[in-house]
Amino acid sequence: AGGESEIHYAPRPEHLNSFDVTHGGACMTLLDVVMATAARSVNQDMGVVTIEMKTSFMRPAKVTPGGRLTAKGRLMHRTKSMAFTEGTIYDEAGLACAHATGTFKYVNRAPDRATEAGIVHPQISTD
């Protein structure tokens, strides 16, 4: 809420690369989601689509078994139709592993056809 978001992520074995650290693609997906969540936190009636994203990897995103990474997103600026964000992934020691900036376009949300059909979505925890 208020232009900020936080997501905790426990990488599964299939999300690790050959060096046994979280794959860069998994990190980029996490950053995309945490930045989009920050952008949407100021207007949950609108959806967002990614226009541009730049990622810098600073250190391996390694976790101990059962451990998790923490991603934090922040809305830096917005206009009526665009959101400018940043996000950082931290390891268990609180060290920054990856940082991204992203630009998102606000769009009208599509109707949730699954809900209309009575299908229940699993809840995603972002604690």
Model-predicted regions and their roles:
Residues 17-29, 48, 64:
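Residues at secondary-structure transition points
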Residues 8, 52, 99-103:
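Well-ordered beta-strand positions in beta-sheet-rich domains
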Residues 38-70:
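Hydrophobic beta-strand-centered segment that forms part of the acyl-chain substrate-binding groove
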Residues 25-45:
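Active-site helix/loop of acyl-thioester processing domains in fatty-acid/polyketide metabolism
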Residues 62-65, 70-127:
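HotDog/MaoC-like acyl-thioester-processing domains
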Residues 1-22:
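Catalytic strand-loop segment that frames the active site of acyl-thioester-processing enzymes
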Residues 9-11, 57, 106:
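Hydrophobic residues in beta-strands and at strand termini
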